[in-house]
Design a protein with these regions (language model features):
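PRPP/pyrophosphate-binding module of the type I phosphoribosyltransferase fold
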Residues: 3-10, 202-276
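Generic N-terminal amphipathic/basic segments
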Residues: 1-88
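Active-site-facing substrate-recognition patch
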Residues: 29-31, 38-42, 61, 70-161, ...
Length: 276
């Protein structure tokens, strides 16, 4: 069982410049390349194994699938020796084209989309997230929530692991509309325990500027988990709207694991353009 300690969060905060996301629609569109000499048939290169390796293993239907670390770059790679595996990986990249794979302390961590294409242009989901967050009074608000719910529903229906969680929970500091989305999900076996988590005080969280200040604020905000929720050996899917630094979600995941959870998955609507 993967554990999360306070030191893990501090290491994560000490940004060394390493990539924290994989996005096949943009920065990693050329992760799969045919070898010009045909030896091997192709190469698959990504900056980290987190989340992507277990999902590829499951989606490609091979328990033997693995990404290996390069001795020269210390980055994951895979030699592809035949056209079938090449096409399988290409299909995986197509299915997850807009999804953002995240490197953090959770067992698995994804965003449905980037929030922006560039500084001036939002993605489709990024625009919906923006409208839901900043224009709840709009006559289109219910349609926006319905669209976001439909997208999350479709995503969870189509991928492994996440839909099999025992619980789903909105990160306590999330905007209210995220709970509306989660409450609209249908046909899953997980129970919504969002109301069982809360902060004892949140003012410091809102005022924190640096990651160091935010971690101090998280420690001082005292996350409360209701006693009646049985977390022992349970898996939980944490949901939030925007993944920026990811610190709050990882802190909540740490506290849930300290309370007995075996696995914590993270799913956000959008990933910010910054933070690698």
């Amino acid at each position: 069982m993967l554990t999360i300690e306070l030191d893990d969060l501090k290491v994560f905060m000490a940004d060394d410049g390493s990539a924290k996301r994989i996005h096949f629609a943009t920065s990693h569109a050329h992760a799969l390349r045919k070898d010009s000499r045909g030896k091997p048939f192709a190469w698959f290169n990504v900056p980290f194994r987190n989340t992507i390796e277990p999902l590829m293993k499951k989606e490609l239907g091979s328990s033997n699938f693995a990404l290996f670390l390069s001795k020269t770059t210390d980055k994951p790679f895979r030699m592809v020796f035949n056209e079938k595996e090449y096409e399988d990986i290409l299909a995986f990249m197509g299915k997850y084209k807009d999804i953002v794979f995240l490197r953090d302390c959770l067992d698995l961590s994804l965003s449905l989309s980037m929030n922006r294409i560039d500084e001036n242009t939002r993605t489709e989901i990024g625009e919906l997230e923006y409208q839901a967050k900043y224009h709840p009074e709009s006559s289109e608000y219910s349609n926006v929530i319905a669209s976001l719910t439909e997208r999350m529903q479709g995503f969870l229906d189509s991928i492994p692991f996440f839909k099999d969680a025992d619980y789903i929970c909105v990160v306590p500091s999330s905007h209210a509309f995220v709970r509306e989305i989660v409450s609209g999900l249908k046909g899953f076996d997980f129970s919504d325990i969002s109301s069982s988590l809360s902060w004892n005080k949140t003012s410091e969280l809102k005022n924190a500027e640096s990651l160091e200040d935010k971690l101090d604020a998280l420690l001082n905000s005292h996350l409360l988990i209701a006693d009646e929720v049985d977390l022992k050996e349970k898996s939980i899917l944490l949901v939030d709207d925007l993944y920026k630094s990811g610190l709050t979600m990882q802190y909540v995941a740490m506290m849930l694991k300290n309370a007995g959870c075996s696995r914590v998955f993270g799913l956000t609507l959008v990933k910010s353009l910054g933070n690698n």
